[in-house]
Regions:
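Conserved pre-motif I regulatory segment
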Residues: 1-23
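Interdomain linker/hinge connecting the two RecA-like lobes of the SF2 helicase core
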Residues: 18-21, 159-283, 288-289
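Conserved Walker A/P-loop ATP-binding site and its immediately adjacent core
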Residues: 26-40, 49-72, 118, 291-292
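Inter-Walker segment of RecA-like/P-loop motor cores
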Residues: 58-102
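Conserved helicase ATPase core of P-loop NTP-dependent helicases/translocases
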Residues: 66, 283-287, 292-334
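Post-DEXD/H (motif II) to motif III coupling segment of the RecA-like Helicase ATP-binding lobe
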Residues: 113-172
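Conserved segment of the helicase C-terminal RecA-like domain
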Residues: 360-389
Length: 404
């Protein structure tokens, strides 16, 4: 589908219902399509005699309000021949404040943020003539919720389809397989952390001795050994959850899974730093798991704790700086100017995050995405799923930084 065909399909589907989920790959123009839909709806015969129209735009973060205002101005605004247009922008965390009036059209930007139970309850109190939900990836359960409760229709165009239809450029994908060190005991494995008493230091070969003695111990181990222990712990919590359906077990399972991905990202910081050194004269974005990782590999770090994040983002787009590292904050509503290389230091099992980041990487006419990953780990599983459907001719396996 072309952008015009996507828009026409949106028009046809919203004629059947009052709720539309627009699930389009990052970079395909969700914002413009939604604004065109708003103008189409409010200029239809149902609103021809209105003197005032209320439009609600819900966003994930406060900074996104500025992005939306810039997009509204860029595409000519929201207009009606006679009615006064009132546009209200609120963050999802302030949804409850929006139940005070009737909105003719509500845009739910990055609609997956409304998926928690508390926000879905708040959603019930909103009075909206039309709902337009936007996201690159809408979770299956949320789609079902809107379908069953609002009779929502969905228009979809994923990254692969957008590339095939030349809406987005086809990236060159560089897979850089790595092996966890299984020789040098450079890591520390903490055992029985909740036990009182002095901390004992030992080696991995004495793991079971310390586990049985219930001593708080720090054991020297290799990268591979530590990753194996993460795998075992995660599998144990997962099995306990499956047996008991205990919410604390589920939370522990997911928490440890996140810590495992964080650890694997930590292990490759040296490799990522070397890649960035090789690309010193290029324009790059590096996706990291934590603030510490971002600050380790780059000088210009965009994250929630950096008061100068917006300034750095603008400096990058103005080409005053060529390298930025990001922690989550650039997953959504960020238009990166002429960014040729994207480096993935960490991976996410979220069905939303990986497609967003890959889409964010396709803003250059000839984008290159570099995936350093550890073989035989959860990273390899996530990566395999993330790139399925991409043109195999555009995927290349490299074994050294010099091949970049």
């Amino acid at each position: 589908m072309t952008r015009e065909e996507i828009y026409q399909q949106c028009v046809e589907k919203i004629a059947k219902t009052n709720a539309l989920m627009v699930e389009l790959a990052t970079g395909t123009g969700k914002t413009k399509i939604s604004l065109d839909l708003v103008n189409y709806l409010i200029n239809s015969k149902w609103y021809e005699d209105r003197k005032e129209l209320n439009i609600l735009i819900l966003v994930a973060k406060r900074v996104h309000k500025q992005t939306w205002q810039a997009e509204i101005d860029k595409w000519g605004g929201i207009h009606h021949p006679t009615a006064k247009i009132n546009v209200r922008m609120e963050c999802y965390e302030s949804m409850h404040k929006c139940a005070d009036k009737l909105y003719d059209v509500a845009i739910f930007d990055e609609v997956h943020h409304v998926g928690s139970e508390s926000r879905l309850e708040t959603l019930k109190a909103l009075r909206c003539g039309y709902i337009i939900g936007l996201s690159a990836t809408i979770p299956r359960k949320l789609k079902q919720y809107f379908k069953y409760n609002y009779h929502a229709e969905t228009v979809t165009c994923d990254i692969v389809e957008a590339i095939e239809n030349e809406i987005l450029p086809e990236p060159q994908i560089l897979l850089f397989p790595l092996m966890l060190d299984n020789r040098n005991p450079t890591e520390w494995l903490e055992i029985n952390a909740k036990e009182k008493g002095p901390i004992v230091r030992g080696t991995y070969k004495d793991l079971w001795k310390y586990k049985k003695s219930k001593q708080h111990a720090m054991l020297a181990c290799t990268q591979r050994q530590k990753a194996i222990e993460y795998d075992k712990l995660i599998e144990w919590f997962k099995k306990q959850y499956m047996l008991r359906h205990s919410e604390p077990m589920k939370q522990s399972w997911l928490f440890q899974a996140g810590k495992r991905l964080e650890y694997l990202a930590d292990c490759k910081l040296g490799i990522v730093t070397d890649i960035l050194y090789k690309l010193a004269n290029e324009r790059t974005i590096t996706f990291c798991k934590t603030i510490e990782q971002a600050e380790s590999v780059g000088k210009y770090c965009i994250h929630s704790q950096n008061a100068k994040a917006d300034e750095m983002y603008n400096s990058f787009n103005q080409k005053k700086i060529n390298h930025i590292t990001a922690v989550n904050i650039l997953n959504e509503n960020a238009n990166l100017v002429d960014c040729k290389y994207a480096i993935f230091c960490n991976y996410s099992s979220s069905e939303v995050c990986m497609p967003q980041r890959i889409g964010r990487s396709l803003r250059h006419k000839s984008p290159i995405i570099i995936f350093p990953y550890y073989q035989g780990t959860r990273e390899e599983e996530i990566l395999k799923k993330a790139i399925e459907g991409f043109n195999k001719d555009s995927i290349k396996v490299i074994h050294s930084i010099q091949e970049i």
